From Swiss-Prot:
Binding-site residues, Mg(2+): D761, D765
Protein name in the entry: Calcium-transporting ATPase 1, plasma membrane-type
GO MF term set: ATP binding; ATP hydrolysis activity; calmodulin binding; metal ion binding; P-type calcium transporter activity
Principal localisation: membrane
Ranges in the topological domain labelled Cytoplasmic: 1-178, 223-258, 377-395, 845, 912-955, 1019-1043
Alphabetically ordered keywords of this record: ATP-binding, Calcium, Calcium transport, Calmodulin-binding, Ion transport, Magnesium, Membrane, Metal-binding, Nucleotide-binding, Phosphoprotein, Translocase, Transmembrane, Transmembrane helix, Transport
Superkingdom of this protein's organism: Eukaryota
Compartment(s): Membrane
Catalysed reaction, written as an equation: Ca(2+)(in) + ATP + H2O = Ca(2+)(out) + ADP + phosphate + H(+)
Activity regulation summary: Activated by calmodulin.
Entry-linked InterPro entries: ATPase_P-typ_cation-transptr_C, ATPase_P-typ_cation-transptr_N, ATPase_P-typ_cyto_dom_N, ATPase_P-typ_P_site, ATPase_P-typ_TM_dom_sf, ATPase_P-typ_transduc_dom_A_sf, Ca_ATPase_N_dom, HAD-like_sf
Region feature (Disordered): 1023-1043
GO CC, one annotated term: intracellular membrane-bounded organelle
Length: 1043
């Protein structure tokens, strides 16, 4: 036994793949290990990517990148190389002319795709192109014209593989080799039956098999098609991206698929360029073209290099872009068509269960051969003793041998559990659909599965733990702090500051901002930007209204956008309050800005020296704000000489300190407590002031008395030994850089073997999201770069949603364990019953039709019932599954072995002594007994299915009616069993059972519930592991030892 177990473990090592980015070698290894023992390759590997097609797609991608590389670095020959023809004229289509356009779609596309500066100059630059596509660079496209533009220049859609129809799934399900063999046997059986027994009795057996095969194929295809619809809906959600455009003179959001040629698109850090286009204006604009060209060097886009390619990512700065080509006229469109051939990687659990299915299939094949051998041996021995011996064969004998072969094939149908890996897909599809309703979009199948094992969550603060609805609660200005939560506070502030101070303050608020105030169609002001910027701009609008001072527009001479590394943003404007002279404004993290200030502006507008004493008072105000859980930002300015130089690094004059309130989300404290109860450590990683971070962390229960709060600079200066000592205690990391988050995640996974989930929203979070076991991007605040590198998108940016993902992840894992336990029990009993009966009686009690029905119960219907059970709160009261834990636990083996022994003993006794025990007599005694055995076997499985809902708890009926799918499947199974026995006897080889025998069958099956309860009282492990739970989770210790 130990030898078999050892060999099985060695074999299953081939089926170990990482959850993220598995190598091609690992993927090919498990495919090779599966071998030829597969009933239906089309269905079993439908969700498994074709590695050869993926390789071809990668080759095509490299070709596209090579062409673009030529376009970027050999611009003179770019168009000739890309189009493989000499430059030709692009005739203007009549439709375009009639619509008022004077340039063709092909010519527009070739300008950007080939970086053709000569053609751009020929068309008089961006302004000339704008005129030829009939658009104003200020007002943008008219919404009423969008449909016409899509008709002339094309829609921003990419060619995708057509969705699979139901008939395709029906075809896949019918390609099962064992079912095809059975269909052949059924056809031969009909032919022989008609020849020997005549019409219609001679056709019953064969037609019964055919009808059952048809039923199996239909139900399988329907289940698979339903899954495909769910995945299709999820895929549509994944591709939803909104971009900001100017249309009808107003800024607004539209879907990336609604972009048309002529649109004016606004781009900022982290955005994906939605189509090919030309740079209009912007600041410090840098894009990453590596996914198209393969070159890692960032590209600076400006008036000197205006070409923007769809699919590239904005790395820095902001800009406006004129769209010139969309959809399949862009290289990104061609690349997307190629990449769609690759498919998604299979999950580790799917691969592992392919290994389990292969082992069980080999055992089943051996039993099928043994059963056929035993049946044939007994038949030949009986025939040898009959008159004529082995030399005399009749049609009846041929029919008997054919039946033996069909029984053996049917055993293989039952024994090879191809439903195991497919059940994972079913469970994941169900979970992903439910999570979508709960505002979590799972981008990768494996993430949902892995999240169930998460032992640590590294979360942002802003927007995740807090509401992200920010307001300026307090302000330090003119040497004093003011509360701004009501009208009185604003009145006190405006009355204490001079007009000079107010103008400088408002200039800084409105011009040193990555957001902007725009007027909507209804005439109301709308702020487009981040919540932090929105809070400050709303404060500025309120001050303007009360002080009756309007800020004056000013041209921006230079801009340094905010990023999470510098923690500041800066701008140089031609300041109206300084007579049009250049003035630099600096805004950002309080400590950073304050350290670069040497002067301070008082309430009268005079500049004073920022002495050490004054600096300490400002720092005290910042600390006081932070201790009240307020985010703090400083605003400063400096008059500069000239307009084209660098933004000053120091020597600024401090204007004000803002204390911004971002309230804790409702339910966050309870969600954090749920994490702790589930054995999941929560760590806050934020760029905020450490006092702000500590206050919020204490409020939501993350920071405890024995936990550590550390700042990023201190953390990154630790050596590996110090990190090994301190990381387990870290609960808060403040003033951190994205690199610090990446380092923390890497060490948690490497040093401590933790399964780490990480939240992120910025472009610079991409490395940490990629490194983590589960990357969680914010759907509202997150950039497109962050979302692309994430495994799950939290649509509402809510920490409680992350807990739902973890709960559903655990549910998937446990549900598959339940299904495996149920299916293995059915497998063992079905194989042993037919083998033992063949050995002792020379016939198989379970006929072909009956075995196919059993296969349907344990495969498709069993997966539907058990793999779609919703999660319960008890799942979050146990620590997570470890990386190295066995999927099939000792508790599962206990239940499988116990139930199998009970069923085998009962069915064995019935087969050998059933007639006398049940007092069955008469000419139909054998048929009656076989029907009773079949009926009892099915009801044993029905009650075992109920038993499998809980692998450890005795109460298996808890929440059974909340799982309507489970209840429906059990009801349908029982109902169809009645129909098979009472109405389809001719085809199913059954006879009518009396009420007494029906009751006896059900009672024997229900005793399985009692057996299950007794088994759950039997301890399966000793020592510290004795408390391991049914699903691989260990219960949390209680009492003094839990501390």
């Amino acid at each position: 036994m130990s030898f078999i177990r050892k060999k099985s473990m060695e074999f299953l090592k081939s089926f170990e793949v990482p959850a993220k980015n598995p190598s091609e070698e690992a993927q090919r290894r498990w495919r090779d290990a599966v071998g030829t023992l597969v009933k239906n390759r089309r269905r079993r590997f439908r969700m498994v990517p074709d590695l050869d097609k993926r390789s071809q797609a990668e080759t095509q991608r490299r070709k596209i990148q090579e062409k673009l590389r030529v376009a970027l670095f050999v611009q003179k020959a770019a168009l000739q190389f890309i189009d493989a023809v000499r430059k030709t004229e692009h005739p203007l289509p009549e439709l375009a002319r009639q619509c008022g356009f004077s340039v063709s779609a092909e010519e527009l596309a070739s300008i950007v795709r080939g970086h053709d500066t000569k053609s751009l100059r020929f068309h008089n630059g961006v302004d000339g192109i704008a005129r030829k596509v009939a658009v104003s660079l200020a007002d943008g496209v008219k919404s009423d014209d969008a449909g016409l533009r899509a008709e002339v220049y094309g829609a921003n859609q990419y060619t995708e593989k057509p969705p699979r129809t139901f008939w395709m799934f029906l075809w896949d399900a019918s390609q099962d080799m064992t079912l095809l063999l059975l269909a052949f046997c059924a056809a031969v059986s009909v032919a022989i039956g008609l020849a020997t027994e005549g019409w219609p009795s001679g056709m019953y057996d064969g037609v019964g098999i055919m009808l059952t095969i048809l039923l199996v194929v239909m139900i399988t295809a329907a289940s698979d098609y339903k899954q495909s619809l769910q995945f299709r809906d999820l895929d549509k959600e994944k591709k939803k991206i909104d971009v900001q455009v100017t249309r009808d003179g107003y800024r607004q959001k539209v879907s990336i698929y609604d972009i048309v040629v002529g649109d004016i698109v606004h781009l900022s850090i982290g955005d994906q360029v939605p189509a090919d286009g030309l740079f209009i204006d912007g600041y410090s604009f840098v894009v990453d073209e590596s996914n198209l060209s393969g070159e890692s060097e960032p590209v600076h886009v400006s008036t000197a290099n205006r070409f923007l390619l769809g699919g590239t990512k904005v790395q820095d700065g902001s800009a406006r872009m004129l769209v010139t080509a969309v959809g399949m006229r862009t290289e990104w469109g061609n690349l997307m068509e190629t990449l769609s051939q690759g498919g998604e990687d299979e999950t580790p659990l799917q691969v592992k269960l392919n290994g389990v299915a292969t082992i069980i299939g080999k055992i089943g094949l051996a039993f099928a051969v043994l059963t056929f051998t035993v049946l044939m041996a007994r038949f030949l021995l009986g025939k040898a003793g009959a008159p004529g011996g082995l030399l005399r064969w009749r049609m009846v004998d041929a029919l008997a041998v054919l039946n033996f072969f069909a029984v053996a094939v049917t055993i293989i149908v039952v024994a090879v559990p191809e439903g195991l890996p497919l059940a994972v897909t079913l469970s994941l599809a169900f979970a992903m659909k439910k999570l979508m309703q709960e505002r979590a979009l799972v981008r990768h199948l494996s993430a949902c599965e892995t999240m169930g094992s998460a032992s640590c969550i590294c979360t942002d603060k802003t927007g995740t733990l807090t509401t992200n609805h920010m307001v300026v609660e307090k302000i330090w200005a003119s040497g004093a702090a003011q509360t701004m939560s009501n009208a009185k506070g604003f009145d006190q502030l405006t009355s204490s500051m001079s007009e000079t101070f107010a103008k400088v303050l408002l200039e800084g608020v409105f011009h040193c901002s990555g957001s902007e105030v725009v007027r909507g169609k209804d005439g109301r002001h709308t702020i487009m930007g981040t919540p932090t910027e929105t809070a400050i701009l709303e404060f500025g609008l309120a001050v303007e209204k009360r002080a009756r001072i309007e800020h004056t527009g000013a041209g921006k001479l230079k801009v340094e956008p905010f990023n999470s590394v510098k923690k500041t943003m800066a701008v140089v404007i031609a300041s109206p309050s300084a007579g049009g002279r250049p003035r630099a404004f600096l805004k950002g993290a309080s400590e950073v800005v304050l350290s670069r200030c040497s002067l301070v502006l008082d309430g009268t507008g005079n500049v004073e020296k920022l002495t050490d004493a004054k600096a300490k008072r400002v720092a005290s105000a910042i600390d006081a704000f932070a201790c009240e859980a307020l985010r703090t930002l400083c605003l400063a300015y400096q008059d500069v000489d000239g307009g084209g130089g660098d933004i000053p690094g120091e020597g600024y004059t401090l204007i004000a300190v803002f204390g911004i309130k971002d309230p804790l989300r409702p339910g966050v404290r309870e969600a954090v407590a749920t994490c702790h109860a589930a054995g999941i450590n929560v760590r806050m990683v934020t760029g905020d002031n450490i006092n702000t971070a500590k206050a919020i962390a204490r409020e939501c229960g993350i920071l405890t008395d024995d936990g550590i709060a550390i700042e990023g600079p201190e953390f990154r200066n630790k050596d590996p030994d110090q990190m090994r000592e301190i990381i387990p205690k870290i609960q808060v990391m403040a003033r951190s850089l994205p690199l610090d988050k990446h380092t923390l995640v890497t060490n948690l996974r490497g040093m401590f073997n933790e399964v780490v989930a990480v939240t992120g929203d910025g472009t610079n979070d991409a490395p940490a999201l990629h490194e983590a076991d589960i990357g969680l991007a914010m759907g509202i605040a997150g950039t497109e770069v962050a979302k692309e590198n994430a495994d799950v998108i939290i649509m509402d940016d809510n920490f409680s949603t992350i807990i739902n993902v973890a709960k559903w992840g655990r549910s998937v894992y446990i549900n598959i364990q339940k299904f495996v336990q149920f299916q293995l029990t059915v497998n063992v009993v079905a194989l042993m019953v037919n083998f033992i009966s063949a050995s002792f009686t020379g016939s198989a009690p379970l006929t072909i039709v009956q075995l196919l029905w059993v296969n349907l119960i344990m495969d498709t219907l069993g997966a539907l019932a058990l793999a779609t059970e919703p999660p319960n709160d008890a799942m979050m009261k146990r620590p997570p599954v470890g990386r190295g834990d066995n999927f099939i636990t000792k508790v599962m083996w206990r239940n499988i072995v116990g139930q199998s022994i009970y069923q085998l003993v009962v069915l064995g006794v019935l087969l050998l002594r059933g007639k006398s025990l049940l007092q069955i007599n008469g000419p139909q005694a054998d048929s009656l007994l076989n029907t009773f055995v079949f009926n009892t076997f099915v009801f044993c499985q029905v009650f075992n299915e109920v038993n499998s809902r809980e692998m450890e708890k005795i109460n298996v009926f808890s929440g059974i009616f909340s799982s309507w799918i489970f209840s429906a499947v059990v009801g349908v199974t029982a109902g169809f069993q009645v129909i098979m026995v009472e109405l389809l006897g001719t085809f199913a080889n059954t006879v009518h059972l009396s009420g007494k025998l029906w009751l006896t069958s059900v009672l024997i099956g229900s005793v399985g519930l009692v057996i299950g309860a007794i088994l759950k009282c039997i301890p399966v492990e000793s020592g510290s592991d004795a408390s391991d739970r049914h699903d691989g989770y260990r219960p949390i210790p209680t009492g003094p030892s839990a501390v």
